[in-house]
């Protein structure tokens, strides 16, 4: 199956990640491999690129497209929240770089047939892992209470008309179950009051359902709790987010890791002994250029945050070769 995806802010990612020959780099959201191919060119001849993705189509495509560099490439059908376990499988202490692109691939939107897009009439599935397991989006909209649906739309979609939309869904599912993306989009559009906005009225509802079905924020939190253990000293982490929920989680975790002394400000000397664990590389989020937005409108809401793991006493200098740890 042809796999189409346009990578966002490729040059900015390369600049922040700074891959070099011999490095181990993990692309935790492999997709079509756009970022990965550019990274691989910079870590050859002795580097190792590791990819993870929940979408089996992405894994199959990667195996075919990167067959020419099989000694420098490994791909896993797994969630990025399990990168530490993946590194263990590879016999690695850590990586020199990790990149996550938290956006939904064009392939999932346009080719998967799983109802990710409100512009298509497809079965309302929304599971990124098409191999099965876990509830589908249609299970959620047909079985959850009105209050539960409203909470999901408000919490994960920041949808201000969440209660109104949830009420309409519950009403309409009594006529017949809601099983397709097109019908759900029509129901949401019929419930929304006010003049048409810049985005489709179903945008936030579809985002919320996708996040809930795939437990996306929990996986992001899990990864961020283990990210330091995944990086070698001097290793860098670069995360591209597309909505404020993800960005707030990343910003908060980066700030916590970069914080030093936590003693009250009126203490004359530090007694906590806490030291910063990372250096934040993006004092302000990096956004796409106007030229990129014009070329790829889907990039308009992208934001990059990046950090570098600081070397600690006894760990040696940063930037060491991850493959040497095998």
Curated annotation (Swiss-Prot):
The gene is rsmH. It comes from the Bacteria. It catalyses: cytidine(1402) in 16S rRNA + S-adenosyl-L-methionine = N(4)-methylcytidine(1402) in 16S rRNA + S-adenosyl-L-homocysteine + H(+). InterPro entries: RsmH, SAM-dep_MeTrfase_MraW_recog, SAM-dependent_MTases_sf. It comes from Desulfatibacillum aliphaticivorans. This is Ribosomal RNA small subunit methyltransferase H. Specifically methylates the N4 position of cytidine in position 1402 (C1402) of 16S rRNA. Keywords: Cytoplasm, Methyltransferase, rRNA processing, S-adenosyl-L-methionine, Transferase. It is found in: Cytoplasm.
